[in-house]
Amino acid sequence: MLQYDPNRYPKCTVPAAEIARVKGLGFLRDKRTADCFNCRVVTGNGKLSAEKLHAIADAAKQFASGEVALTSRMNVEVQGIPFENIEAFTAFLAEYGLEPGGTGPRVRPVVSCKGTACVFGLIDTYGLSEKIHYLYYKGYHNVKLPHKFKIAVGGCPNNCVKPDLNDIGIIGQWVPVANAEKCVGCGACVKTCPVDACHVEEGKYVRTTKDCNSCGRCVRACHVGALAYEHGYRVTLGGRWGKKVARGIALSHLFTSEEEVLALVEKAILLFRDQGVAGERFADTLARIGIENAEQILLSDELLNRKEEILAKAL
């Protein structure tokens, strides 16, 4: 059995008020030192240019310990920045269009998979996540929420970026649409389906809707053009990971345009600010008000019409 040693790490020499202030800027205390901090450098959606990567490396060498780590939300953490270097470090990053962030009860940095480039990707994940970053991470940066609010964009139902473990998750969809006249009953669709959601019956393609995750593989496998698809976005709400775990609940509505999805993201943020209680996660808010009720509100324009009122109210 081990005994806790309160003196295991150096005592911090930075005042508590300053620790709290810089934490709000994206600098977290490094417990290994008396006065150093680790900074989360926001990537936007997990993608960086070579120039920006070089800039982060240069900043790590010039103002910090030279150590760089990657966060679970695809940001870059520069470690071991002395307190007195924080201002200069931030100014250096700004020259390259980079900034610290990713802390506090607000919209957190957006996570995206590589769906734009991936062979399984069904939507432009880079493009959509970048729009969400500018509209809602940056656009809502000064809006205080009841708790952190995480957003993830996944290109397909493989869910590599785990969208349904975020407060709002977006998943690319290809919903198969069959043309029975063209179907020759070859079974190529059946062989490629990873979830056994289709079969050939009386020589024709049949899809089991409740099992299909709309990954689009059957559409690609059909060599006679008997399968077209409806392009869309599945949205999940209320996912979370950590001490308490919850998978996001998929809305019944399939969204068919980026504009619809972007509007829904804003509505979800406004719903959380309007009906959330300080200290509770979005999953708790949804459990309290009911997911069916939440979906009804989100599919209307009520929240957008009340946007100024909601943003002005005190939490």
Region locations from a protein language model:
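Intrinsically disordered, low-complexity polar/charged tails and linkers
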Residues: 1-36
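Small-residue-enriched alpha-helical segments and adjacent helix-cap loops
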Residues: 9-15, 37-184, 188, 192, ...
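Short beta-strand elements
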Residues: 29, 168-172, 233-241
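C-terminal, charged low-complexity interaction regions
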Residues: 293-315
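A glycine-rich phosphate-binding loop feature that marks nucleotide/adenosyl-phosphate handling sites
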Residues: 150-157, 283-294
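A hydrophobic, small-residue-rich beta->alpha segment in the mid-to-C-terminal subdomain
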Residues: 239-277
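Flexible, glycine/charged-enriched surface loops at secondary-structure junctions
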Residues: 65-72, 103-105, 142-148, 200-201, ...
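Iron-sulfur cluster-binding cysteine motifs and their immediate structural context
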Residues: 188-207, 213, 217-233
